[in-house]
Design a protein with these regions (language model features):
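Extracellular glycoside hydrolase catalytic/binding regions
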Residues: 76-77, 161-163, 168-189, 193-341
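Terminal connector regions
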Residues: 477, 482-507
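Aromatic-rich peripheral "rim/lid" segments of glycoside hydrolase catalytic domains that contact
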Residues: 323-402
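Asparagine-centered strand-capping/turn motif at beta-strand->loop junctions
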Residues: 426-430
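Low-complexity, acidic Ser/Thr/Pro/Gly-rich terminal tails and inter-domain linkers that flank the onset
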Residues: 400-418
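Aromatic-lined substrate-binding rim segments of carbohydrate-active enzymes
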Residues: 76-152, 211-226, 325-342, 346
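Short, solvent-exposed loop/turn segments enriched in Ser/Thr/Gly
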Residues: 414-423, 435, 481
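N-terminal carbohydrate-binding accessory modules
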Residues: 29-96, 110-113, 117-120, 391
Protein backbone atom coordinates (compact mmCIF):
# COMPACT_ATOMS: atom_id res chain seq x y z
CA UNK A 1 0.00 0.00 0.00
CA UNK A 2 2.81 2.41 0.89
CA UNK A 3 4.79 1.47 -2.22
CA UNK A 4 1.75 1.89 -4.43
CA UNK A 5 1.18 5.37 -3.03
CA UNK A 6 4.81 6.33 -3.66
CA UNK A 7 4.64 5.19 -7.30
CA UNK A 8 1.43 7.16 -7.86
CA UNK A 9 2.96 10.24 -6.24
CA UNK A 10 6.00 10.11 -8.55
CA UNK A 11 3.74 9.77 -11.58
CA UNK A 12 1.60 12.70 -10.45
CA UNK A 13 4.65 14.90 -9.92
CA UNK A 14 5.95 13.94 -13.37
CA UNK A 15 2.62 14.77 -15.00
CA UNK A 16 2.44 18.11 -13.20
CA UNK A 17 5.93 19.00 -14.40
CA UNK A 18 5.06 17.94 -17.94
CA UNK A 19 1.91 20.08 -17.94
CA UNK A 20 3.92 23.05 -16.70
CA UNK A 21 6.41 22.61 -19.56
CA UNK A 22 3.69 22.25 -22.19
CA UNK A 23 1.30 24.97 -21.05
CA UNK A 24 3.67 27.36 -19.32
CA UNK A 25 3.56 28.79 -15.79
CA UNK A 26 0.08 28.96 -14.27
CA UNK A 27 -1.45 27.02 -17.13
CA UNK A 28 -2.12 23.75 -15.32
CA UNK A 29 -5.88 23.13 -15.67
CA UNK A 30 -7.81 23.83 -12.49
CA UNK A 31 -10.80 21.94 -11.16
CA UNK A 32 -14.16 23.60 -11.62
CA UNK A 33 -15.17 25.45 -8.45
CA UNK A 34 -17.69 23.68 -6.24
CA UNK A 35 -21.27 24.94 -6.54
CA UNK A 36 -22.57 27.03 -3.67
CA UNK A 37 -19.30 28.80 -2.93
CA UNK A 38 -19.33 32.01 -0.92
CA UNK A 39 -22.20 34.45 -0.65
CA UNK A 40 -25.05 34.26 -3.12
CA UNK A 41 -26.71 36.90 -5.27
CA UNK A 42 -29.52 37.09 -7.78
CA UNK A 43 -29.76 37.50 -11.52
CA UNK A 44 -33.33 37.78 -12.72
CA UNK A 45 -35.11 34.72 -11.35
CA UNK A 46 -31.93 32.77 -10.61
CA UNK A 47 -29.69 32.49 -7.59
CA UNK A 48 -25.95 32.49 -8.30
CA UNK A 49 -23.02 31.71 -6.03
CA UNK A 50 -19.90 33.85 -5.76
CA UNK A 51 -18.47 32.18 -8.89
CA UNK A 52 -21.60 32.89 -10.92
CA UNK A 53 -22.81 29.28 -10.86
CA UNK A 54 -26.54 28.61 -10.68
CA UNK A 55 -27.62 27.42 -7.23
CA UNK A 56 -30.89 26.54 -5.57
CA UNK A 57 -32.08 26.05 -2.01
CA UNK A 58 -33.66 22.63 -1.51
CA UNK A 59 -33.93 22.73 2.22
CA UNK A 60 -35.78 22.13 5.46
CA UNK A 61 -37.07 24.10 8.46
CA UNK A 62 -35.82 23.14 11.93
CA UNK A 63 -37.81 25.12 14.44
CA UNK A 64 -37.55 25.65 18.19
CA UNK A 65 -35.35 28.71 18.70
CA UNK A 66 -38.48 30.83 18.24
CA UNK A 67 -40.15 29.11 21.23
CA UNK A 68 -39.57 29.39 24.97
CA UNK A 69 -36.97 26.61 24.63
CA UNK A 70 -34.71 29.14 22.83
CA UNK A 71 -32.99 26.34 20.93
CA UNK A 72 -33.87 24.00 18.06
CA UNK A 73 -36.25 21.29 19.18
CA UNK A 74 -35.32 17.66 19.61
CA UNK A 75 -32.06 18.29 21.43
CA UNK A 76 -33.68 16.61 24.41
CA UNK A 77 -33.41 13.40 22.36
CA UNK A 78 -30.40 13.72 20.04
CA UNK A 79 -27.26 15.68 19.39
CA UNK A 80 -27.45 18.64 17.05
CA UNK A 81 -24.60 17.31 14.90
CA UNK A 82 -26.43 14.02 14.44
CA UNK A 83 -29.53 15.95 13.34
CA UNK A 84 -27.58 17.97 10.79
CA UNK A 85 -25.72 14.93 9.51
CA UNK A 86 -29.05 13.23 8.89
CA UNK A 87 -30.37 16.27 7.02
CA UNK A 88 -27.32 16.14 4.81
CA UNK A 89 -27.70 12.40 4.25
CA UNK A 90 -31.24 13.03 3.02
CA UNK A 91 -29.85 15.55 0.47
CA UNK A 92 -31.16 18.80 1.96
CA UNK A 93 -28.77 21.66 1.26
CA UNK A 94 -30.26 24.59 3.18
CA UNK A 95 -31.52 25.06 6.73
CA UNK A 96 -34.17 27.68 7.45
CA UNK A 97 -33.64 28.47 11.12
CA UNK A 98 -36.49 30.31 12.92
CA UNK A 99 -35.80 32.50 15.95
CA UNK A 100 -37.56 34.98 18.23
CA UNK A 101 -36.23 38.38 19.26
CA UNK A 102 -36.86 37.30 22.85
CA UNK A 103 -34.00 34.82 22.45
CA UNK A 104 -31.57 37.75 22.65
CA UNK A 105 -32.95 39.01 26.00
CA UNK A 106 -30.69 38.42 28.99
CA UNK A 107 -33.24 36.25 30.81
CA UNK A 108 -33.88 33.87 27.91
CA UNK A 109 -32.04 30.73 28.97
CA UNK A 110 -32.04 27.77 26.55
CA UNK A 111 -33.68 24.71 28.07
CA UNK A 112 -34.88 21.16 27.34
CA UNK A 113 -31.47 20.08 26.06
CA UNK A 114 -29.86 16.75 26.94
CA UNK A 115 -26.30 17.89 27.58
CA UNK A 116 -25.00 14.32 27.62
CA UNK A 117 -25.85 14.29 23.91
CA UNK A 118 -24.90 17.95 23.37
CA UNK A 119 -22.00 18.57 25.78
CA UNK A 120 -20.64 21.53 23.84
CA UNK A 121 -23.94 23.41 24.28
CA UNK A 122 -23.75 23.39 28.09
CA UNK A 123 -23.95 26.90 29.53
CA UNK A 124 -24.38 28.65 26.18
CA UNK A 125 -26.80 31.45 25.37
CA UNK A 126 -29.40 31.11 22.65
CA UNK A 127 -27.23 33.01 20.18
CA UNK A 128 -24.22 30.87 21.03
CA UNK A 129 -26.28 27.74 20.36
CA UNK A 130 -27.24 29.17 16.98
CA UNK A 131 -23.52 29.75 16.40
CA UNK A 132 -22.82 26.07 17.07
CA UNK A 133 -25.60 24.87 14.79
CA UNK A 134 -24.59 27.25 12.02
CA UNK A 135 -20.91 26.43 12.44
CA UNK A 136 -21.43 22.72 12.02
CA UNK A 137 -23.96 23.20 9.21
CA UNK A 138 -21.33 25.10 7.26
CA UNK A 139 -18.70 22.48 8.01
CA UNK A 140 -20.79 19.78 6.32
CA UNK A 141 -21.85 21.91 3.35
CA UNK A 142 -25.26 23.27 4.34
CA UNK A 143 -26.32 26.89 3.87
CA UNK A 144 -28.47 28.71 6.45
CA UNK A 145 -31.28 31.25 6.18
CA UNK A 146 -32.23 33.05 9.40
CA UNK A 147 -35.98 33.45 9.86
CA UNK A 148 -37.34 36.06 12.28
CA UNK A 149 -40.34 33.93 13.15
CA UNK A 150 -41.81 35.76 16.15
CA UNK A 151 -41.16 38.94 18.15
CA UNK A 152 -41.62 37.00 21.41
CA UNK A 153 -41.78 33.29 22.13
CA UNK A 154 -45.51 33.38 22.84
CA UNK A 155 -46.74 33.29 19.28
CA UNK A 156 -46.84 34.67 15.75
CA UNK A 157 -47.62 38.35 15.15
CA UNK A 158 -49.48 39.73 12.14
CA UNK A 159 -47.26 42.81 11.99
CA UNK A 160 -43.49 42.95 12.24
CA UNK A 161 -43.66 44.73 15.60
CA UNK A 162 -45.51 44.60 18.92
CA UNK A 163 -45.63 46.92 21.93
CA UNK A 164 -42.95 44.85 23.66
CA UNK A 165 -40.77 44.49 20.55
CA UNK A 166 -41.14 47.63 18.42
CA UNK A 167 -39.86 48.10 14.90
CA UNK A 168 -36.64 49.64 16.22
CA UNK A 169 -35.84 46.42 18.09
CA UNK A 170 -36.73 44.28 15.05
CA UNK A 171 -34.28 46.24 12.91
CA UNK A 172 -31.52 46.53 15.51
CA UNK A 173 -31.56 42.77 16.11
CA UNK A 174 -31.25 42.18 12.37
CA UNK A 175 -28.32 44.61 12.24
CA UNK A 176 -26.71 42.78 15.17
CA UNK A 177 -27.06 39.42 13.40
CA UNK A 178 -25.73 40.85 10.14
CA UNK A 179 -22.61 42.06 11.97
CA UNK A 180 -22.31 38.90 14.04
CA UNK A 181 -22.25 36.64 10.98
CA UNK A 182 -20.37 38.99 8.66
CA UNK A 183 -17.77 36.99 6.77
CA UNK A 184 -19.49 33.67 7.55
CA UNK A 185 -20.66 32.49 4.14
CA UNK A 186 -22.78 29.72 5.65
CA UNK A 187 -25.44 32.32 6.49
CA UNK A 188 -26.67 33.58 3.15
CA UNK A 189 -29.87 35.43 3.92
CA UNK A 190 -32.42 37.08 6.20
CA UNK A 191 -36.11 36.12 6.06
CA UNK A 192 -37.29 39.41 7.53
CA UNK A 193 -40.58 38.41 9.20
CA UNK A 194 -42.59 35.23 9.12
CA UNK A 195 -46.08 35.28 7.60
CA UNK A 196 -47.23 38.91 7.67
CA UNK A 197 -51.03 39.09 7.52
CA UNK A 198 -53.92 41.46 8.13
CA UNK A 199 -53.84 44.21 9.18
CA UNK A 200 -50.54 44.10 7.28
CA UNK A 201 -50.96 45.33 3.70
CA UNK A 202 -48.84 45.61 0.56
CA UNK A 203 -48.59 48.98 -1.14
CA UNK A 204 -51.22 50.78 0.95
CA UNK A 205 -48.74 53.46 2.04
CA UNK A 206 -49.53 53.31 5.76
CA UNK A 207 -46.15 53.25 7.52
CA UNK A 208 -47.61 51.24 10.41
CA UNK A 209 -49.15 48.55 8.19
CA UNK A 210 -47.46 48.53 4.78
CA UNK A 211 -45.25 45.45 4.90
CA UNK A 212 -43.50 46.34 1.66
CA UNK A 213 -42.25 49.64 3.12
CA UNK A 214 -41.20 47.97 6.37
CA UNK A 215 -39.29 45.31 4.43
CA UNK A 216 -37.42 48.08 2.61
CA UNK A 217 -36.48 49.76 5.89
CA UNK A 218 -35.20 46.56 7.46
CA UNK A 219 -33.61 45.22 4.30
CA UNK A 220 -31.64 48.38 3.65
CA UNK A 221 -30.55 48.59 7.29
CA UNK A 222 -29.18 45.04 7.02
CA UNK A 223 -27.43 45.73 3.73
CA UNK A 224 -25.78 48.82 5.20
CA UNK A 225 -24.12 46.49 7.71
CA UNK A 226 -23.62 43.39 5.56
CA UNK A 227 -24.13 43.99 1.85
CA UNK A 228 -23.66 40.31 1.01
CA UNK A 229 -26.87 38.89 2.46
CA UNK A 230 -29.91 37.97 0.46
CA UNK A 231 -32.96 39.87 1.69
CA UNK A 232 -35.91 37.48 1.74
CA UNK A 233 -39.31 39.16 1.75
CA UNK A 234 -42.51 37.20 2.25
CA UNK A 235 -45.90 38.31 1.02
CA UNK A 236 -49.04 39.14 2.98
CA UNK A 237 -52.37 37.30 3.04
CA UNK A 238 -54.66 39.59 1.05
CA UNK A 239 -54.37 41.99 -1.87
CA UNK A 240 -57.29 43.89 -3.42
CA UNK A 241 -59.73 41.53 -1.70
CA UNK A 242 -58.03 38.36 -2.96
CA UNK A 243 -57.07 36.21 0.03
CA UNK A 244 -54.41 33.54 0.23
CA UNK A 245 -52.16 31.90 2.85
CA UNK A 246 -50.44 34.11 5.44
CA UNK A 247 -47.20 35.36 3.92
CA UNK A 248 -48.04 33.88 0.54
CA UNK A 249 -49.74 36.70 -1.36
CA UNK A 250 -47.16 38.55 -3.45
CA UNK A 251 -49.58 39.93 -6.04
CA UNK A 252 -48.76 43.49 -4.95
CA UNK A 253 -45.07 43.10 -5.78
CA UNK A 254 -45.90 43.59 -9.46
CA UNK A 255 -47.07 47.18 -8.93
CA UNK A 256 -45.16 47.88 -5.72
CA UNK A 257 -41.76 46.12 -5.89
CA UNK A 258 -39.40 46.05 -2.93
CA UNK A 259 -36.65 48.62 -3.46
CA UNK A 260 -33.26 47.78 -1.99
CA UNK A 261 -30.13 49.93 -2.02
CA UNK A 262 -27.93 47.01 -3.12
CA UNK A 263 -28.79 45.39 -6.43
CA UNK A 264 -29.27 41.65 -6.88
CA UNK A 265 -30.17 40.85 -3.27
CA UNK A 266 -33.97 40.46 -3.27
CA UNK A 267 -35.61 37.04 -2.95
CA UNK A 268 -39.40 36.86 -2.80
CA UNK A 269 -40.81 34.21 -0.51
CA UNK A 270 -44.23 32.58 -0.19
CA UNK A 271 -45.82 29.95 2.05
CA UNK A 272 -48.30 27.36 0.83
CA UNK A 273 -50.06 24.58 2.69
CA UNK A 274 -52.41 21.66 2.23
CA UNK A 275 -55.98 21.08 3.32
CA UNK A 276 -54.71 19.44 6.53
CA UNK A 277 -53.72 22.96 7.65
CA UNK A 278 -56.84 24.80 6.44
CA UNK A 279 -59.60 23.80 3.98
CA UNK A 280 -59.09 26.55 1.41
CA UNK A 281 -61.86 26.69 -1.23
CA UNK A 282 -59.58 25.65 -4.08
CA UNK A 283 -59.18 22.19 -2.57
CA UNK A 284 -62.88 21.55 -3.30
CA UNK A 285 -62.75 22.84 -6.87
CA UNK A 286 -63.93 20.14 -9.33
CA UNK A 287 -60.77 20.81 -11.34
CA UNK A 288 -58.44 20.13 -8.37
CA UNK A 289 -55.45 19.68 -8.54
CA UNK A 290 -55.27 21.07 -12.08
CA UNK A 291 -56.47 24.44 -10.75
CA UNK A 292 -53.46 24.92 -8.49
CA UNK A 293 -50.87 26.13 -11.02
CA UNK A 294 -52.97 29.17 -11.93
CA UNK A 295 -53.39 30.04 -8.23
CA UNK A 296 -49.66 29.78 -7.63
CA UNK A 297 -48.92 31.78 -10.79
CA UNK A 298 -51.17 34.60 -9.60
CA UNK A 299 -49.82 34.83 -6.07
CA UNK A 300 -46.07 34.22 -6.41
CA UNK A 301 -45.07 32.06 -9.37
CA UNK A 302 -45.34 34.98 -11.81
CA UNK A 303 -42.25 36.56 -10.22
CA UNK A 304 -40.19 33.56 -11.26
CA UNK A 305 -41.85 32.99 -14.62
CA UNK A 306 -41.49 36.66 -15.60
CA UNK A 307 -37.82 36.71 -14.53
CA UNK A 308 -38.49 39.36 -11.86
CA UNK A 309 -36.85 37.71 -8.85
CA UNK A 310 -35.99 34.31 -7.40
CA UNK A 311 -38.78 32.71 -5.40
CA UNK A 312 -38.27 30.75 -2.19
CA UNK A 313 -41.20 28.64 -1.04
CA UNK A 314 -40.16 29.04 2.56
CA UNK A 315 -42.80 26.82 4.13
CA UNK A 316 -45.04 24.05 2.83
CA UNK A 317 -46.09 20.94 4.66
CA UNK A 318 -48.76 18.32 5.21
CA UNK A 319 -49.72 15.30 7.25
CA UNK A 320 -50.50 13.48 3.96
CA UNK A 321 -53.56 11.92 5.63
CA UNK A 322 -56.00 13.33 3.06
CA UNK A 323 -55.69 12.15 -0.55
CA UNK A 324 -56.03 15.79 -1.60
CA UNK A 325 -52.88 16.56 0.38
CA UNK A 326 -51.04 13.92 -1.59
CA UNK A 327 -52.23 15.39 -4.89
CA UNK A 328 -51.33 18.89 -3.69
CA UNK A 329 -47.76 17.95 -2.75
CA UNK A 330 -47.15 15.98 -5.95
CA UNK A 331 -48.44 18.89 -8.06
CA UNK A 332 -46.52 21.50 -6.08
CA UNK A 333 -43.16 19.77 -6.38
CA UNK A 334 -43.59 19.41 -10.13
CA UNK A 335 -44.50 23.12 -10.32
CA UNK A 336 -41.30 24.13 -8.51
CA UNK A 337 -39.22 22.28 -11.10
CA UNK A 338 -36.08 20.17 -11.02
CA UNK A 339 -32.37 20.97 -11.11
CA UNK A 340 -30.50 24.10 -10.12
CA UNK A 341 -32.75 26.36 -12.18
CA UNK A 342 -35.98 25.51 -10.34
CA UNK A 343 -37.64 27.53 -7.60
CA UNK A 344 -36.06 27.24 -4.17
CA UNK A 345 -37.86 25.63 -1.24
CA UNK A 346 -37.52 24.79 2.46
CA UNK A 347 -39.99 22.15 3.60
CA UNK A 348 -41.94 22.51 6.86
CA UNK A 349 -40.63 20.81 8.84
CA UNK A 350 -37.81 18.64 10.14
CA UNK A 351 -39.61 18.48 13.49
CA UNK A 352 -42.30 15.87 14.12
CA UNK A 353 -43.94 18.18 16.71
CA UNK A 354 -45.54 20.58 14.23
CA UNK A 355 -49.21 20.10 15.08
CA UNK A 356 -50.70 20.87 11.65
CA UNK A 357 -48.20 19.02 9.51
CA UNK A 358 -45.91 16.71 11.45
CA UNK A 359 -42.42 16.50 10.03
CA UNK A 360 -39.87 14.58 8.02
CA UNK A 361 -38.88 12.88 11.27
CA UNK A 362 -41.31 10.56 12.99
CA UNK A 363 -42.23 11.02 16.64
CA UNK A 364 -39.10 9.23 17.84
CA UNK A 365 -37.03 12.12 16.41
CA UNK A 366 -34.86 9.58 14.56
CA UNK A 367 -36.70 7.61 11.89
CA UNK A 368 -37.86 9.25 8.68
CA UNK A 369 -41.39 9.60 7.36
CA UNK A 370 -40.48 7.90 4.12
CA UNK A 371 -43.82 8.73 2.47
CA UNK A 372 -43.14 12.47 2.74
CA UNK A 373 -39.48 12.14 1.90
CA UNK A 374 -40.32 10.23 -1.27
CA UNK A 375 -42.22 13.24 -2.67
CA UNK A 376 -39.18 15.48 -2.10
CA UNK A 377 -36.37 13.12 -3.07
CA UNK A 378 -36.37 13.82 -6.85
CA UNK A 379 -35.97 17.55 -6.19
CA UNK A 380 -33.26 17.56 -3.51
CA UNK A 381 -29.84 18.61 -4.79
CA UNK A 382 -27.65 17.69 -1.81
CA UNK A 383 -25.12 19.64 0.23
CA UNK A 384 -22.53 21.99 -1.20
CA UNK A 385 -18.78 21.91 -0.49
CA UNK A 386 -17.42 21.57 3.03
CA UNK A 387 -18.36 17.96 3.69
CA UNK A 388 -14.95 17.30 5.18
CA UNK A 389 -14.58 14.06 3.20
CA UNK A 390 -10.88 13.77 2.34
CA UNK A 391 -11.55 11.36 -0.51
CA UNK A 392 -10.04 7.91 -0.96
CA UNK A 393 -7.70 6.40 1.58
CA UNK A 394 -7.41 6.76 5.31
CA UNK A 395 -8.31 10.29 6.54
CA UNK A 396 -5.15 10.37 8.63
CA UNK A 397 -2.94 10.20 5.55
CA UNK A 398 -1.47 7.56 3.23
CA UNK A 399 -0.02 4.32 4.46
CA UNK A 400 -1.21 1.46 6.61
CA UNK A 401 -3.46 2.43 9.55
CA UNK A 402 -2.15 1.62 13.02
CA UNK A 403 -3.33 -1.49 14.83
CA UNK A 404 -6.64 -0.95 16.58
CA UNK A 405 -8.07 -2.22 19.84
CA UNK A 406 -11.78 -1.57 19.92
CA UNK A 407 -15.12 -2.56 21.32
CA UNK A 408 -18.45 -2.32 19.50
CA UNK A 409 -21.96 -2.37 20.96
CA UNK A 410 -24.78 -2.86 18.44
CA UNK A 411 -28.29 -1.94 19.63
CA UNK A 412 -31.64 -1.99 17.82
CA UNK A 413 -33.49 1.16 18.90
CA UNK A 414 -36.82 0.81 17.11
CA UNK A 415 -38.35 -1.81 14.86
CA UNK A 416 -41.51 -2.17 12.80
CA UNK A 417 -42.75 -4.44 10.08
CA UNK A 418 -40.21 -4.18 7.29
CA UNK A 419 -37.66 -1.94 8.96
CA UNK A 420 -35.73 -0.78 12.00
CA UNK A 421 -33.20 1.71 13.35
CA UNK A 422 -30.01 0.74 15.14
CA UNK A 423 -27.06 2.45 16.74
CA UNK A 424 -23.46 1.31 16.98
CA UNK A 425 -21.25 2.54 19.81
CA UNK A 426 -17.53 2.33 19.08
CA UNK A 427 -15.01 2.48 21.94
CA UNK A 428 -11.29 2.96 21.43
CA UNK A 429 -9.91 0.45 23.94
CA UNK A 430 -6.35 0.79 22.71
CA UNK A 431 -3.52 3.07 23.82
CA UNK A 432 -3.27 5.09 20.60
CA UNK A 433 -5.71 7.75 19.40
CA UNK A 434 -7.65 7.22 16.20
CA UNK A 435 -7.30 9.85 13.50
CA UNK A 436 -10.06 8.75 11.17
CA UNK A 437 -11.81 5.39 11.21
CA UNK A 438 -13.72 2.97 8.98
CA UNK A 439 -16.17 0.51 10.54
CA UNK A 440 -17.17 -2.60 8.58
CA UNK A 441 -19.68 -5.36 9.27
CA UNK A 442 -21.97 -7.73 7.39
CA UNK A 443 -25.72 -8.20 7.79
CA UNK A 444 -26.76 -11.84 8.26
CA UNK A 445 -29.95 -11.45 6.22
CA UNK A 446 -31.60 -9.19 3.64
CA UNK A 447 -31.21 -5.95 5.61
CA UNK A 448 -30.39 -2.81 3.62
CA UNK A 449 -29.26 0.54 5.03
CA UNK A 450 -31.56 3.25 3.69
CA UNK A 451 -29.95 6.17 5.53
CA UNK A 452 -27.53 6.84 8.36
CA UNK A 453 -26.16 9.59 10.56
CA UNK A 454 -22.88 10.60 12.21
CA UNK A 455 -20.96 8.64 9.54
CA UNK A 456 -20.81 8.23 5.77
CA UNK A 457 -22.70 4.98 5.16
CA UNK A 458 -22.52 2.63 2.17
CA UNK A 459 -23.48 -0.96 1.46
CA UNK A 460 -22.42 -3.54 -1.13
CA UNK A 461 -24.37 -6.76 -0.91
CA UNK A 462 -24.42 -7.72 2.76
CA UNK A 463 -21.29 -5.69 3.58
CA UNK A 464 -21.84 -2.35 5.32
CA UNK A 465 -19.23 0.40 5.69
CA UNK A 466 -19.38 3.49 7.91
CA UNK A 467 -16.61 6.10 7.55
CA UNK A 468 -15.84 8.85 10.04
CA UNK A 469 -16.88 12.42 9.35
CA UNK A 470 -14.75 15.53 9.75
CA UNK A 471 -15.94 16.19 13.29
CA UNK A 472 -15.77 12.67 14.81
CA UNK A 473 -12.71 11.09 13.21
CA UNK A 474 -10.47 11.72 16.23
CA UNK A 475 -11.16 9.23 19.05
CA UNK A 476 -8.92 9.35 22.12
CA UNK A 477 -7.98 6.19 24.02
CA UNK A 478 -10.90 5.17 26.20
CA UNK A 479 -13.35 7.43 24.37
CA UNK A 480 -16.53 6.30 22.64
CA UNK A 481 -18.77 7.57 19.88
CA UNK A 482 -22.15 6.49 18.57
CA UNK A 483 -23.39 6.30 14.99
CA UNK A 484 -26.72 5.09 13.70
CA UNK A 485 -28.75 4.04 10.70
CA UNK A 486 -32.18 3.13 9.42
CA UNK A 487 -32.60 -0.07 7.43
CA UNK A 488 -35.19 -2.18 5.70
CA UNK A 489 -35.63 -5.83 6.58
CA UNK A 490 -35.80 -7.71 9.86
CA UNK A 491 -34.16 -6.40 13.02
CA UNK A 492 -33.64 -9.91 14.40
CA UNK A 493 -30.37 -10.60 12.60
CA UNK A 494 -27.43 -9.04 14.44
CA UNK A 495 -24.01 -8.70 12.76
CA UNK A 496 -21.57 -11.19 14.27
CA UNK A 497 -18.29 -9.37 13.62
CA UNK A 498 -17.12 -5.77 13.39
CA UNK A 499 -13.82 -4.48 11.98
CA UNK A 500 -12.39 -1.02 12.63
CA UNK A 501 -9.62 0.09 10.25
CA UNK A 502 -9.34 -3.53 9.07
CA UNK A 503 -8.79 -4.81 12.62
CA UNK A 504 -11.35 -6.99 14.46
CA UNK A 505 -13.23 -5.46 17.39
CA UNK A 506 -14.61 -7.04 20.52
CA UNK A 507 -18.40 -7.18 20.13
Amino acid sequence: MTGSYGTKRILLLFMAALLALVFGPGAVPRAHAAAGTGYWHTSGRQLLDSNGQQVRMTGINWFGAETSNFSPHGLWTRGYKSMLDQMKSLKYNTLRLPYTNQLFDSGSAPNSIDYTKNPDLQGLSGLQILDKVIGYAGQIGLKVVLDRHRPDAGGQSALWYTDAYPESRWISDWEMLARHYAGNTTVIGADLHNEPHAPACWGCGDQTKDWRLAAERAGNAILAVNSNWLIIVEGVDGYNGDNYWWGGNLQGAAQYPVRLNVANRLVCSAHDYATSVYPQPWFDDPDFPNNLAAIWDKNWGYLYKNNVAPVLLGEFGTTLTDTRDQAWLRTLMAYLGTGASGMSFTFWSWNPNSGDTGGILNGDWTTVNTAKQAYLDPYLLGAFDGSGDPGGGDPGGPGTPPAVSCKVAYTVQNSWQGGFTAQVTITNSGSDPLNGWTLEFAFPGDQKVSQGWSATWSQSGDDVTAKSMAWNGAVAPGASLTVGFQATGSSSGTPAEFDLNDQPCEA
